[in-house]
């Protein structure tokens, strides 16, 4: 438990350093001594042995490097894969390198070999590298020496070399040298009963830092290695569970509170192989490093305490019996330990000198006792034949096996006298027995037992059969044994085949049901007799093929786990597979995020404002988070919510303790930091409502209130101010209520006051905590509001550099992507070649380049030889358009994709090097005299980290920061006539000459018209304000200054109405020319043209449908001289022709009217007839040539002075959804949420600290909000009935009422004028109420 102050931290640090040194000093040579001594050259002949020799002059004793004794080296009698050369060093050595040479001056040499090692000359272990049983490249001639440094040193007394391949024109010939140094360590043997305690001098041990190191080996899968506990609930336990290492730790829990300190971490696998494994536990407070066999796992303990409090002792080898359930339910350790060090104390040395008293009954010895089991290792082409006793009426076989494969043949044997056969196999992870009978009507008896037996653990199988009876038992569980009493006659045969069966070798026509077994077996018994595998190895009796006796070389390919981001690893014998479901990632190793890195990226995929999952660091460790992307402006806002309600009352303050308000965000602080770091600008609104509650205590006092931001730093400024300035917004603007103070609240008034504003220094954001004081006085009150974090822009997405000449390059630090690497970027160029990037190692390298105008190449070498993947494009890539390149390489495969072309994939070899080892700097744009890249690269990300090309270009001579020409690639995103404008970071769409609004000029701009309302657009702006809302009609300007005559025009608009007849659009002139679009009493559409030259206007009647049906309709009218094209909704365009006598010019256009025509002079009778009472409904997208009258009325544009409005114009989209870029299909769109409630769609990923809050609102808030919604709905329903009663005679169109409706011209105007919170436009697609 943590209770004491931090006294003694210096001593603890010294202990940390000393113990770290000591724990290594007992197990390794001094760091000043290079471990590279030749270990073979001085050995006598008797230290060498081999499988065979041609003769005495070829004996293994002559296999010393650079020696010519005898025949010049060792050569076996037969050159096959069963030969080996063995060296005994006399005692254990630390081995760091190996070298080989062929037999002197001959054609005999080995080209590939394996190295096995052992402490006893039994139970051999093959040398592993990069997760595989390693095959060393050998010699290419007889006298050259080939030396290999081991990737990690090994400790062994015996080394065995097994030739895999040799010179085809000669035979096996070998001379060797092994390099290393002496090794010594104290060893203790634990028999499973004895426990070794180390008792503390003061009966207690309170530590902030610990270092515990030891080596162990065992053939048991369960057992406690060390244990310590304290009376306050602290404990530490290191134990084996199912042959995996488990560290359990508790630094303290609070029984009465929410603090739960138990932490458990599992690592390793197959640790019951009776080979040495090293463990180091390093603890500093709650930070833990657990290292097993050079693989380190870092984690932090649960809870809030830092000290480990142990009482009396720490024990090794088990838990002393204390009467507690935990002490009797766990098995003690059975095996060997060496070099046990606890915080600098050499436990093994104390035990050897009898300074420690073992507890429990048992034997403690100081030499390692080896097991008597002999394992045998099978591969896909192996089998083991052992003899049996012929013609016995009892068939009995038992063995233990371990494997990763769910299927495989375990045992096969024929009965004597052709009675049938028995096959025992593994089928879908169960053991099955199939007895084929040839003498009875029943042809086969099948029984099975067990489940999940391909988990890599040892499992025991016992099968017994006799007349009319058989029983199958798994793992000694007699209660679950499977029996059968089917008719059966048994006479045992003379051969038993384990692991495989070859028909052609045994004159059998029987086909086994399963493929050969891949795994290990041991303790094989046939006819109740233990099989002597050493005799089988000498083929007396029995035989075998491709098996390794006295070795179990099973590999756990899921340790270490190459499946990233929580992917689940499953394996077979020679491969593994990652399941990435519900992780948010994809790919062979769950490396690639399925989400975009930012809202900016979603915008350019055509998405609209909504909730999205983003992954700011891509393939990095942070994971995805859910944010709201607001895309209604040119720059996208990313909004991260939290759980604090607006105007939350501040309670709980007293003079001794401040009130602390903690904000819980819908993402972790690391995730939010990734957003703020990449954003161009961030802000967060804060407000403090106060009544006799001071805020910052300005001008000179200590602040009563502060907020905590990123990195847990306190800040003493408020919204609207900046860092280092203890002021509020009013203090900056000098308009505080009392000018003596810098905050309104600091004046300490008894009336409610407010200090509010935006915090915009993004390096301090987000606000994670607000600490409030000064609310304890009589009458003091305060309310706190903190808005969501809002960030704008994405510096990473447009981060770019221009490469002005082929010899230019940018350099960065070495790329770290040993086992997993992903690279993505955009490029554009006019040249057909160039190196994008390159990083070199001693032999390894990685390179991406444009090889030709249509080819992109990804090449690399991890030690297995160069690999190149090429994507070929059907169209040139040097077209000055942006193209995206994505390359990935991991231990499973490598891939390359360009744009949306098919991805090219190359599988990695099942054996070989897997680590990409690079040493040089990373060069972007080419280096080393190669053909450099000429063009532009942007958004270069490597393993989730964006390289800052812009900043590096600024400090590199000859470079241009940023890129131009974005419109060449993205200009098509600007729709409806919008113009693409280049920006330093990207581009924008200019919608000023369109009837649309929004980022891509795809948002409708429309308005709702009530009866009698109208809009006039004068083609020449008058001198006075044309937007005066009076009903005055200005006199026409001088005709000489009117709009020029038109030989062609285009009119586009959308409308919806339920009233007919009405005028939709009317264009007048200073002559008699006009153009009108109207709805007739029947609801049909009519276009009337009068260009002069005809007695009557030319009419186009569209009679095939009722247009006054309340649905939105789009109209496009285009005239070129006498030809008119009309397109209505989705119908095909229809052409019409004006009479031959008609003029071709629209003379002197004057004004454009919407809703109603208010014009002086003579008006066409048909127009006059339909002009009353006027249009009621919605108009949008109205455009006449380059003029958008509605947009000019609703937006402050240069044309706004031309507009005059009668009535209150209320914006609406007329029920039409805004146009968007062509969306991706839902099948390929991982962020597609349309099938869910976008505000509540939850991804099953927990991004760190607790469960993510839906849209930043917790469950309690949702319940409160639901109750409030029900109350409001009830009130609104009551109001609707009251309004229906009060206005039952008026019959006009209404939307929601608001205060001040009596003085407003409409209910909608009342909402706009009186409700400051009203920000949404009226959506006519919603249900309309006719009152």
From Swiss-Prot:
Q: Indicate which residues are glycosylated according to the record.
A: 289, 346, 363, 379, 436, 506-507, 546, 630, 735, 1116, 1198
Q: Where in the cell is it found?
A: Membrane; Cell projection, Axon; Cell junction, Paranodal septate junction
Cysteine disulfide links: 35-181, 336-368, 520-552, 558-569, 563-578, 580-590, 936-963, 967-980, 974-989, 991-1001, 1178-1214
- Determine if Transmembrane is one of this entry's keywords: yes
Tell me which parts of the chain lie in the Extracellular compartment. 28-1262
Keywords for the protein's UniProt record, in alphabetical order:
Autism, Autism spectrum disorder, Cell adhesion, Cell junction, Cell projection, Chromosomal rearrangement, Disulfide bond, EGF-like domain, Epilepsy, Glycoprotein, Intellectual disability, Membrane, Phosphoprotein, Repeat, Signal, Transmembrane, Transmembrane helix
- All copies of the Fibrinogen C-terminal domain together span 592-798
Domain named EGF-like: residues? 554-591, 963-1002
Q: Which domain of life is it from?
A: Eukaryota
Signal peptide coordinates = 1-27
The record's section on Pfam families has: F5_F8_type_C, Laminin_G_2
- GO terms under biological process: adult behavior; brain development; cell adhesion; cell population proliferation; cerebral cortex development; clustering of voltage-gated potassium channels; learning; limbic system development
> Which family is this protein grouped under?
Belongs to the neurexin family.
Its function, per the record, reads: Required for gap junction formation. Required, with CNTNAP1, for radial and longitudinal organization of myelinated axons. Plays a role in the formation of functional distinct domains critical for saltatory conduction of nerve impulses in myelinated nerve fibers. Demarcates the juxtaparanodal region of the axo-glial junction.
Associated clinical condition: Autism 15: A complex multifactorial, pervasive developmental disorder characterized by impairments in reciprocal social interaction and communication, restricted and stereotyped patterns of interests and activities, and the presence of developmental abnormalities by 3 years of age. Most individuals with autism also manifest moderate intellectual disability. A chromosomal aberration involving CNTNAP2 is found in a patient with autism spectrum disorder. Paracentric inversion 46,XY,inv(7)(q11.22;q35). The inversion breakpoints disrupt the genes AUTS2 and CNTNAP2.
Kindly state the subunit structure of this protein: Interacts (via C-terminus) with KCNA2. Interacts with GPR37.
Q: Spell out the protein name for this chain.
A: Contactin-associated protein-like 2
Q: Which organism is it from?
A: Homo sapiens (Human)
What are the leading ranks of the lineage? Eukaryota, Metazoa, Chordata, Craniata, Vertebrata
Q: What's the name of its gene?
A: CNTNAP2
């Amino acid at each position: 438990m943590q209770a004491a102050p931090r006294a003694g931290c210096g001593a603890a640090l010294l202990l940390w350093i000393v113990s770290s040194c000591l724990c290594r000093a007992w197990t390794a040579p001094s760091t000043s001594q290079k471990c590279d001594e030749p270990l073979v050259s001085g050995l006598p002949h008797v230290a060498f042995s081999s499988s065979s020799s041609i003769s005495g002059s070829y004996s293994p004793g002559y296999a010393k490097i650079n020696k010519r004794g005898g025949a010049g080296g060792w050569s076996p009698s037969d050159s096959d894969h069963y030969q080996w050369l063995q060296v005994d060093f006399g005692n254990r050595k630390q081995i760091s390198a190996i070298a080989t040479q062929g037999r002197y001056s001959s054609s005999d040499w080995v080209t590939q070999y394996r190295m096995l090692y052992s402490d006893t000359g039994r139970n051999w272990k093959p040398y592993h590298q990069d997760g595989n049983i390693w095959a060393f490249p050998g010699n290419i001639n007889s006298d050259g020496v080939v030396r290999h440094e081991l990737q990690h040193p090994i400790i062994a007394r015996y080394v065995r070399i097994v030739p895999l391949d040799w010179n085809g024109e000669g035979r096996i010939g070998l001379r060797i040298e092994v390099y290393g140094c002496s090794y010594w360590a104290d060893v203790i043997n634990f028999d499973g009963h004895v426990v070794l305690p180390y008792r503390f001098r003061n009966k207690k041990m309170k530590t902030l830092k610990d270092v515990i190191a030891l080596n162990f080996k065992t053939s048991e899968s369960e057992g406690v290695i060390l244990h310590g506990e304290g009376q306050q609930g602290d404990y530490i336990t290191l134990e084996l569970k199912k042959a995996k290492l488990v560290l359990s730790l508790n630094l303290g829990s609070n029984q009465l509170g929410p603090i739960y300190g138990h932490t458990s971490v599992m690592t390793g696998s197959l640790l019951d192989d009776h080979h040495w494994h090293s463990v180091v536990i390093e603890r500093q407070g709650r930070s833990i490093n657990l290292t097993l066999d050079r693989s380190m796992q870092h984690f932090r303990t649960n809870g809030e305490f830092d000290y480990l409090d142990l009482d009396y002792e720490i024990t090794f080898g088990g838990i002393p019996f204390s009467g507690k359930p935990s002490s009797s339910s766990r098995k003690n350790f059975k095996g060997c330990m060496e070099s046990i060090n606890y915080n600098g104390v050499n436990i093994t040395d104390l035990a050897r000198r009898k300074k420690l008293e073992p507890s429990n009954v048992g034997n403690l010895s100081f030499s390692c006792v080896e097991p008597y089991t002999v394992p045998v290792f099978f591969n896909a082409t192996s089998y083991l034949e052992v003899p049996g006793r012929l013609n016995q009426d009892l068939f009995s076989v038992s063995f233990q096996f371990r494997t990763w494969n769910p299927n495989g043949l375990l045992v096969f044997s024929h009965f004597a006298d052709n009675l049938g056969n028995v096959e025992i196999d593994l089928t879908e992870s169960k053991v099955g027995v199939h007895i084929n009978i040839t003498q009875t009507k029943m042809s086969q008896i099948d029984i099975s037992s067990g489940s999940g037996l391909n988990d890599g653990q040892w499992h025991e199988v016992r099968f017994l059969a006799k007349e009319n009876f058989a029983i199958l038992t798994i793992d000694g569980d007699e209660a679950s044994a499977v029996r059968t009493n089917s008719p059966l006659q048994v006479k045992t045969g003379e051969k038993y085949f384990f692991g495989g069966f070859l028909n052609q070798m045994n004159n059998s026509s029987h086909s086994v049901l399963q493929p050969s077994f891949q795994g290990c077996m041991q303790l094989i018994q046939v006819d109740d007799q233990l099989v002597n595998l050493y005799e089988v190895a000498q083929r007396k009796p029995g035989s075998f093929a491709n098996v390794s006796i006295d070795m179990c070389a099973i590999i756990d390919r899921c340790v270490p786990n190459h499946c990233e981001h929580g992917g689940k690893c499953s394996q077979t014998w020679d491969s593994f597979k990652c399941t990435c479901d519900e992780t948010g990632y994809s790919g062979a190793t769950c490396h690639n995020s399925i989400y975009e890195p930012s809202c900016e990226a979603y915008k350019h995929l055509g998405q609209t404002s909504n909730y999205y999952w983003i992954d700011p660091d891509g393939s990095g460790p942070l994971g995805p988070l859910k944010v709201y992307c607001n895309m209604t402006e040119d720059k996208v806002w990313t909004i991260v919510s939290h759980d604090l309600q607006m105007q939350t009352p501040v309670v709980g303050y007293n003079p001794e303790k401040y009130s602390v308000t903690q904000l819980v965000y819908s993402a972790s602080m690391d995730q939010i930091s990734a957003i703020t770091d990449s954003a161009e600008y961030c802000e967060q609104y804060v407000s403090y409502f106060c009544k006799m509650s001071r805020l910052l205590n300005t001008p000179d006092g200590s602040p009563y209130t502060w907020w905590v931001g990123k990195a847990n730093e306190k800040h003493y400024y408020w919204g609207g101010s900046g860092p280092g300035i203890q002021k509020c917004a009013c203090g900056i603007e000098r308009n505080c209520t009392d000018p003596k103070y810098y905050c309104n609240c600091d004046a300490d008034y008894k009336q409610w006051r407010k200090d509010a504003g935006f915090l915009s220094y993004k390096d301090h954001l987000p606000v994670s905590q607000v600490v409030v004081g000064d609310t304890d006085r009589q009458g003091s009150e305060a309310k706190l509001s903190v808005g969501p974090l809002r960030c704008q822009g994405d510096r990473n997405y447009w981060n770019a550099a221009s490469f002005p000449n082929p010899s230019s390059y940018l350099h960065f630090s070495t790329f770290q992507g040993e086992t997993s690497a992903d690279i993505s970027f955009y490029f554009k160029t006019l040249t057909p070649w160039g190196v994008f990037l390159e990083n070199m190692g001693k032999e390894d390298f990685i390179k991406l380049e444009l090889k030709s105008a249509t080819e992109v190449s990804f090449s690399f070498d991890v030690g297995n030889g160069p690999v190149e993947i090429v994507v070929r494009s059907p169209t040139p890539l040097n077209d000055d358009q942006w193209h995206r390149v994505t390359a990935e390489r991991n231990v499973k495969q490598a891939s390359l994709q360009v744009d949306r072309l098919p991805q090219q994939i190359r599988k990695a070899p099942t054996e070989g090097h897997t680590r990409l080892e690079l040493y040089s700097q990373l060069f972007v744009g080419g280096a080393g005299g190669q053909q450099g890249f000429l063009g532009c690269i942007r958004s270069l990300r490597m393993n989730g980290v964006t390289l800052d090309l812009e900043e590096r270009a600024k400090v590199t001579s000859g470079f241009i920061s940023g890129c131009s020409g974005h419109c060449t690639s993205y200009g098509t995103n600007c729709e409806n006539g919008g113009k693409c404008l280049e920006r330093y970071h990207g581009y924008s769409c200019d919608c000023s000459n369109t009837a649309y609004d929004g980022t891509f000029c795809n948002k409708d701009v429309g308005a709702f018209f009530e009866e009698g309302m109208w809009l006039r657009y004068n083609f020449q702006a008058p001198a006075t304000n044309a937007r005066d809302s009076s009903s005055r009609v200005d006199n026409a300007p001088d005709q000489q200054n009117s709009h020029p005559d038109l030989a062609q025009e285009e009119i586009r608009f959308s409308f919806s109405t339920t009233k007919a007849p009405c005028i939709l659009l009317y264009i007048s002139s200073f002559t008699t020319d006009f153009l009108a679009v109207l709805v007739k009493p029947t609801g049909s559409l009519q276009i009337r043209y009068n260009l002069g030259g005809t007695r009557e206007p030319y009419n186009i009647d569209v009679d095939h449908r009722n247009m006054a049906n309340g649905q939105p309709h789009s109209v496009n009218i285009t005239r070129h001289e006498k030809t008119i094209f009309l397109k209505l909704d989705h119908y095909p365009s229809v052409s019409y022709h004006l009479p031959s006598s008609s003029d071709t010019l629209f003379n002197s256009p004057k004004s454009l009217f919407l809703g109603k025509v208010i014009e002086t002079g003579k008006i066409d009778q048909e127009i006059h007839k339909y002009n009353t009472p006027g249009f009621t409904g919605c108009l949008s997208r109205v455009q006449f040539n380059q003029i958008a009258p509605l947009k000019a009325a609703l937006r402050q544009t240069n044309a706004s002075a031309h507009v005059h409005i009668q009535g209150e114009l209320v914006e609406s989209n007329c029920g039409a959804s805004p146009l968007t870029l062509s969306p991706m299909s839902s099948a390929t769109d991982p962020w597609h949420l349309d099938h869910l409630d976008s505000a509540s769609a939850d991804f099953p990923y927990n991004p760190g600290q607790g469960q993510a809050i839906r849209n930043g609102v917790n469950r309690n808030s949702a319940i409160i909000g639901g109750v409030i919604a029900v109350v409001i709905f009830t009130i609104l329903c009551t109001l609707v009935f009251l309004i229906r009663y009060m206005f039952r005679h008026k019959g006009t169109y209404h939307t929601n009422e608001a205060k001040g409706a009596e003085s407003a011209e409409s209910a909608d105007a009342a909402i706009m004028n009186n409700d400051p919170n009203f920000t949404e436009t009226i959506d006519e697609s919603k249900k309309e109420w006719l009152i």
